[in-house]
Regions:
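Perimembrane helix-loop-helix junctions
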Residues: 43, 195-199, 203-207, 227-261, ...
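Transmembrane alpha-helix segments characteristic
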Residues: 66-70, 159, 163, 214, ...
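Signature aromatic-anchored transmembrane alpha helix within multi-pass, membrane-resident enzymes
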Residues: 67, 257, 261, 399-432
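Short acidic/glycine- and proline-prone juxtamembrane loop motifs at membrane-interface regions
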Residues: 132, 168, 174-182
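Hydrophobic/aromatic-rich transmembrane helices and adjacent perimembrane loops
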Residues: 172-173, 179, 220, 226, ...
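Membrane-embedded, lumen/periplasm-facing catalytic core of multi-pass transferases
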Residues: 193, 414-477, 481, 485-486, ...
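Membrane-lumen/periplasm interface segments of specific transmembrane helices
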Residues: 250-331
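Hydrophobic, aromatic-rich transmembrane alpha-helices
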Residues: 312-356
Length: 538
């Protein structure tokens, strides 16, 4: 019997039976209930009935293919030769055989834990990059699994392609920075929450996975977790009448609170141990980003790369980066809004609860994160990855509805527009990625040439590398690669405890008084024309 005949008679094909079994395993109730729900949802939705059978034929193969394509793109387009820069050097040195670099108030411990299996064994940057790329693909796949259920698998995979196709996701996934992982944790957590709310019941495994996703996100970026899952808590309380779902809401809220307690609790404990308490740590975090000043446009200006600041004196682009790409970003935003309506129609159609609120949950959480990162004076493109990951779900919902709801020529036109949207993303975002990676490679070569110059000058452990108040941008990474300690703006030699001292200053600047008569060496030509003052007689 052909697939279409089985489909028309309501019988599940083997990939769908596997999907139904997986749903039943992660939620309460027998497998037959999951299969019946999948079948009834398909019959009830005319758009789903109209979907092409071959799109359903792959089943879980769609998310697997999307994650594999993302991982392959990382290996093809991200260079393994890019060295560790400032932030990466700090994270890589924490759980390793290396001298730990100074820990800042703005950082969280999740990322050093993630890469500990590599950093404990080797200092190879190539090994670290390969590990991060593979883990990034696995993380994207696991996050997509959380959204399987009433959405066809190809729609979930499409969301993964939309997010994974962004230049910032491809670049950051290969770097030792936390925002990509915060996006993965937030995406998985919101998906698990919505799936339980949509089904009206939870399971022990589902609650445990939700708590794990919240904990993971909070360990990566506590602020992201508080915003995303704080909003999810509010939605959990208001989306269903308490008289009908008290146990469900209690279980989900308990998982979220437990996850936040573990992840944010670690941050609070560390605040008391090393930073004088949470309030002082928050103040130090604000200072690290240049302060706080609300600006809702700055992040939009750098969606396609660059740096921007709300205050004079900090590096900032003029105007908008890559203005022609604004048309695609605008289409992305419009699709995300349409996706709220689409999800209400074919995912959250049950009138027993506030389907509009659940359909809008990804957009609400995305807007919350965007508002959070509209406050720092120095904004960075990478901070918004949780925003794009959540909006990708709504955009994929919109595309599904647009290509299945209409008939005849309208459907053909909708499919063509959807293909153009995805193709335009992959093409234009790759161009931005290539330009950004070229800049990082150039900076990386300059940094490593300067490190080699210092090595030839006899800089060896035990040593300390410091800078004047005008810090050279590669001071800390140089300390990492040379096996030295790093001290910001050392004021006297007693801080070195007898170790060799190297002072790096920008060209034309003067070092601290204790180093003014040391031999000055102009290092490899890089931004700022740095000069190194190396202590002799050691």
């Amino acid at each position: 019997m052909s697939y279409w005949a089985r489909y028309a008679r309501g019988r599940l094909w083997w990939p769908e039976r596997l999907a139904a079994g997986w749903i039943a395993w992660t939620t309460s109730g027998p497998r037959s209930d999951a299969a019946a729900e999948t079948r009834s949802a398909r019959r009830a939705d005319p758009g789903a009935e109209a979907a092409k059978p071959w799109l359903r034929g792959w089943g879980i193969g769609w998310p697997i293919a999307a994650a594999a394509a993302f991982t392959l793109a990382l290996f093809l387009f991200d260079s393994l030769r890019i060295p560790l820069f400032w932030d990466e050097s700090v994270y890589a040195s924490q759980i390793s055989q290396h001298v730990p670099m100074p820990w800042g108030a703005e950082r969280a411990r999740g990322l050093p834990l993630l890469v500990a299996p590599v950093t404990l064994l080797t200092g190879s940057v190539v090994a670290l990059r390969v590990y991060l790329m593979v883990m990034a693909g696995i993380g994207l796949f696991l996050a997509m699994l959380a959204w399987r259920g009433r959405r066809p698998d190809w729609v979930v995979a499409l969301a993964g392609v939309i997010f994974g196709g962004l230049w910032v996701a491809q670049q950051q996934a290969a770097l030792l920075l936390p925002s990509y992982w915060s996006a993965i944790g937030g995406l998985a957590g919101v998906g698990l929450f919505l799936r339980a709310m949509e089904r009206g019941r939870s399971s022990t495994l589902g609650v445990a996975l939700l708590a794990a996703a919240v904990t993971f996100t909070a360990l990566m970026r506590p602020a992201d977790a508080v915003v995303i899952f704080g909003l999810v808590l509010v939605i959990a309380v208001t989306a269903r009448p308490w008289g009908q779902a008290t146990s469900l809401v209690t279980a989900l809220a308990g998982a979220i609170v437990a996850g936040l307690a573990i992840g944010v609790g670690e941050w609070v404990t560390e605040s008391y141990l090393y930073f004088g308490g949470p309030l002082r740590r928050l103040h130090a975090m604000s200072a690290a980003s240049g302060g706080r000043k609300l600006n809702l446009l700055n992040n939009l200006r750098i969606m396609s790369g660059g740096l921007v600041s709300s205050k004079p004196g900090f590096p900032s682009i003029r105007g908008w980066s890559h203005p022609p790409l604004l048309a695609w970003w605008a289409a992305f935003g419009v699709l995300a809004l349409i996706g709220v309506y689409a999800a209400r129609r074919y995912v959250y159609a049950d009138r027993r609860y506030r389907g509009w609120l659940l359909a809008a949950t990804p957009v609400i959480c995305a807007l919350g994160v965007y508002a959070l990162y509209s406050l720092p004076v120095r904004d960075n493109t990478r901070y918004l990855q949780p925003v794009w990951a959540l909006l990708a779900i709504s955009a994929a919902d919109a595309i599904y509805w647009l290509v299945t709801a209409p008939r005849g020529r309208l459907r053909v036109a909708a499919i063509a527009v959807a293909c153009v949207f995805v193709a335009a993303e992959l093409g234009t975002q790759h161009a931005v990625l290539a330009a950004e990676n070229a800049q990082r490679l150039t900076a990386g070569r300059g940094q490593m040439n300067a490190v080699q110059d210092m090595r030839q000058l006899g800089v060896r452990p035990p040593c300390v590398i410091t800078s004047s108040r005008l810090a050279v941008w590669f001071t800390l990474p140089a300390a990492y690669y040379l096996g030295c300690s790093y001290v910001w703006h050392m004021t006297n030699l007693t801080q070195a405890d007898g170790r060799q001292v190297v002072v790096l200053v920008p060209g034309g600047a003067r070092p601290q008084p204790f180093a003014q008569y040391w031999p000055a060496h102009r290092l490899a030509k890089t931004a700022g024309n740095p000069v190194g003052y190396v202590e002799t007689g050691r």
